[in-house]
């Protein structure tokens, strides 16, 4: 699930006393989160905290296993599309059940897709279903939701028809296409997925003792899950911990079994907990969105000035200190390779470089174009240590450009930040974006008209034309597709529709008492695959 993420140290980790007993069968796994879970409604969630929870409690047709391979879930097998790659027909398991014991049906998927796309839902995730036939007409209200290219052929047979072939669609199926419990939705209405009393689950766990304002919640094994006998961790307790120092202290005291840390703590943690420190590259981009509705931040030369002022290597090495790496483009390293086997970014031009001379040159141009000597920009961030550190670094770099570049920082809770971004109540900000399928288009869409989270509302005809060419897969080889994507990324580096900052690394502290808990490049760790060591 492509999602908004925290910068630097991300979402995962917990709290409570570790057992010294070797019998861990009833032991609660304790971890932490940096933010609250906002919703477990798969049609509405946009943030990493919510989608980490959803990935544990809701399963779709396919899923990714612990090695990142696509495997069947509610569908009985991985199907081959027909109709020139546009039609997928799935038979569903008869033993897939919701946590109330009722069966998951094809109608639950149809209801979910229609609800996510229809305009009255106002889902920021609607665009993830944009490949389905008649999406545009339904999403704009020109056609009824019943016209969307999805049908329940029978109680346990589902058909999805796309408007065009999509080469990575198995990943979309595994990470974006989730059912909703139709009966629960009819009963609960707008309360669906907003607290644990109104949360439907067909996955390995169900969420308990939770609402969007609570700092603690628990995942409890779902006894109706079709694979429940393979789920070893029976209970997972989460506690919101916003500072890495507190997370480290809790792990040192054995009050938690897993947490995520960042910054200067990483080096010491590696020494103290060598066998329990897990460093993983993560397919997640940190970037600056610019509000294109505002004259100041719409100015290309101002955006270029700040981009050139940011020393991404120094930011990663001296501020984050957690293995994060400088962004080369809007697409993270490792997402995809070109025909020669080289990383995608090897073919991207207009490199993101640090050059104060150029930064000052473009700032002067911005002053002239805006008719202002002093330029004020407020940078919106979430209120965590990692966010604040990155924002303060950017603020200091702006001052190096000119005393007249007045960049101020406003730190607020992530939920409010997302709300302000959605309402365009910002100048610029800091955000993270992750995807769940190995194709650059989801990152390139951060600056396209169809972008799910294009808060900037930035558009450019030349850029959009390339995006449209990328999306026209009918007469396109994989090599041609990658070249078009590299062309788009190169243009975006030049035009700064968004300003890439760095690629996340995740550093987790994980108890030696557990095995099978992995941190993938794409997607989220899955607790159903973890187990206590005997």
Give the positions of each predicted feature:
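N-terminal lobe/hinge region of extracytoplasmic solute-binding protein
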Residues: 33-81, 200
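Ligand/substrate-recognition segments at binding pockets and active sites
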Residues: 212, 356, 361-435, 450, ...
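Gly/Pro-rich hinge or "lid" segments in bacterial periplasmic/extracellular proteins
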Residues: 162-231, 235
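Aromatic- and charge-enriched surface segment that lines or borders ligand/interaction sites
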Residues: 76-128, 296
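Detector for C-terminal structural segments
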Residues: 309-339, 385-395, 422-534
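Ligand-site clamp/hinge motif
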Residues: 224-269
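Surface-exposed binding/hinge segments that line
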Residues: 125-183
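Structural transition elements
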Residues: 326-365, 386-388
């Amino acid at each position: 699930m492509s999602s908004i993420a925290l910068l630097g140290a991300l979402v995962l980790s917990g709290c409570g006393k570790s057992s010294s007993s070797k019998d861990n069968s009833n032991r609660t796994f304790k971890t932490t989160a940096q933010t609250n879970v906002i919703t477990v409604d798969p049609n509405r969630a946009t943030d990493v905290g919510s989608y980490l929870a959803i990935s544990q409690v809701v399963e779709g047709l396919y899923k990714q296993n612990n090695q990142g391979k696509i495997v069947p879930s509610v569908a009985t097998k991985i199907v081959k599309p027909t109709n020139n790659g546009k039609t997928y027909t799935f038979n569903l398991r008869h033993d897939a059940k919701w946590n109330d014991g009722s069966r998951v049906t094809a109608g639950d998927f149809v209801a979910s897709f229609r609800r996510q796309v229809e305009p009255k839902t106002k889902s920021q995730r609607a665009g993830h279903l944009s490949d389905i036939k008649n999406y545009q007409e339904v999403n704009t209200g020109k056609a009824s939701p019943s016209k969307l290219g999805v049908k329940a052929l029978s109680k346990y047979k589902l058909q999805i028809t796309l408007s065009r072939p999509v080469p990575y669609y198995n990943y979309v199926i595994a990470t974006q296409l989730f059912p909703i419990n139709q009966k629960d939705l009819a009963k609960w209405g707008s309360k669906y997925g907003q607290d644990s009393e109104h949360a439907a689950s067909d996955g390995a766990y169900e969420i308990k003792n939770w609402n969007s304002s609570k700092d603690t919640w628990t995942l409890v094994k779902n006894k109706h899950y079709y694979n429940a006998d393979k789920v070893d961790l029976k209970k997972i307790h989460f506690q919101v911990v916003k500072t890495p120092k507190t997370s480290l202290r809790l792990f040192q005291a054995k009050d938690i079994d897993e947490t995520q840390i960042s910054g200067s703590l990483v080096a010491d943690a590696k020494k103290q907990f060598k066998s329990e420190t897990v460093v993983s590259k993560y397919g997640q981009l940190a970037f600056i969105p610019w509000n294109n509705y505002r004259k100041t931040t719409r100015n290309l030369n101002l955006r270029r000035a700040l981009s050139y002022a940011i020393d991404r290597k120094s930011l990663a090495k001296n501020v984050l200190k957690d293995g994060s790496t400088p962004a080369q483009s809007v697409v993270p390293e490792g997402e995809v390779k070109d025909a020669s086997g080289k990383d995608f970014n090897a073919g991207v031009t207009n490199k993101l470089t640090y050059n104060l001379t150029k930064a000052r040159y473009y700032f002067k141009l911005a002053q002239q174009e805006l008719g202002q000597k002093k330029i004020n920009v407020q940078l919106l961030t979430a209120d965590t240590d990692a966010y604040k550190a990155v924002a303060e670094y950017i603020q200091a770099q702006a001052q190096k450009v000119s005393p007249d570049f007045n960049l101020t920082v406003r730190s607020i809770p992530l939920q409010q930040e997302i709300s302000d971004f959605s309402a365009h109540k910002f100048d610029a900000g800091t955000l993270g974006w992750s995807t769940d399928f190995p194709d650059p288009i989801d990152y390139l869409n951060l600056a396209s008209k169809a972008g799910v989270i294009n808060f900037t509302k930035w558009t450019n005809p030349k850029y959009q034309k390339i995006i449209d060419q990328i999306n026209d897969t009918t007469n396109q080889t994989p090599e041609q597709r990658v070249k078009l994507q590299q062309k788009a990324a190169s243009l975006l580096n030049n035009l700064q529709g968004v300003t890439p900052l760095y690629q996340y690394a995740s550093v987790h502290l994980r108890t030696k008492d557990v095995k099978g808990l992995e941190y993938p490049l794409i997607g989220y760790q899955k607790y159903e695959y973890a187990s206590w060591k005997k």
